[in-house]
Amino acid sequence: PYGIGTLGKAAYDFADFLHAAGQHCWQMLPLGPTSYGDSPYQSFSTYAGNPYFIDLELLIEDGLLTRDEVESQNWGTNPRYVDYGRIYESRFAVLQKAKDRGWERDQAEVAAFQAENCRWLPDYALYMACKRHFGMRSWTEWDDADIRLRRSPEVLEQYRTLLREDVELFTYLQFLFFRQWNRLRDYLHSLDTVSYTHLTLPTT
């Protein structure tokens, strides 16, 4: 009901359907965050998950959002059509509220998630924060050559400090995505079903 399919009830219902039909494999398109053109095969990261797939009903159940906050957004009028421009605005508006409520509350779990994914998560979160800072333009068009080309430790730390709120946001969204994805994957395994995803063409 909120613009795009998610890792929520519909996914579990489909898993049950596969199980009832005697199927043991669910093949999916890449699950990474999409870039310009919204193709799942062109992603900002090989490792990150797409925040669009975070289920908002589960966030309501978890106390991170209210139903009024979710239903007040414009998700489009055609349930068969994904309006990526619209859900970009609407999703990040409500996901920001979820982060504002959950970042401190979930800090112990988030810290463990960060440690487990330290090889890619800090760079991804900083890259996305910088991309937002520079108007979502391609990194080749960023105004600051120091972050665009040289990426010295000092410059990276400068931008981590400057963009701390957005770095936290993109970190927390990955935490939420993988918490929901891992629960769905565990449910699939309980049904003796495995999921396969295609590889993406990463840009980071």
Where on the chain are the PLM-derived regions?
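Short, flexible loop/turn elements at secondary-structure junctions
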Residues: P1, P30-G32, K131
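Mature N-terminal, pre-catalytic/accessory segment of carbohydrate-active enzymes
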Residues: P1-K9
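Short secondary-structure boundary/capping segments
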Residues: G5, S35, P40-Y47
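Conserved small/polar residues in nucleotide/adenosyl-binding loops
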Residues: T197-T203
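Acidic, His- and aromatic-enriched active-site or binding-groove loops in soluble protein domains
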Residues: S43-L65
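Catalytic domains of carbohydrate-active enzymes, especially glycoside hydrolases
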Residues: A10-L31
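Active-site-proximal, well-structured secondary-structure segments within enzyme catalytic domains
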Residues: T66-D192, Y196
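Short, solvent-exposed turn/loop segments enriched in Gly/Ser/Thr/Pro and often Arg
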Residues: Q27-G37, L199
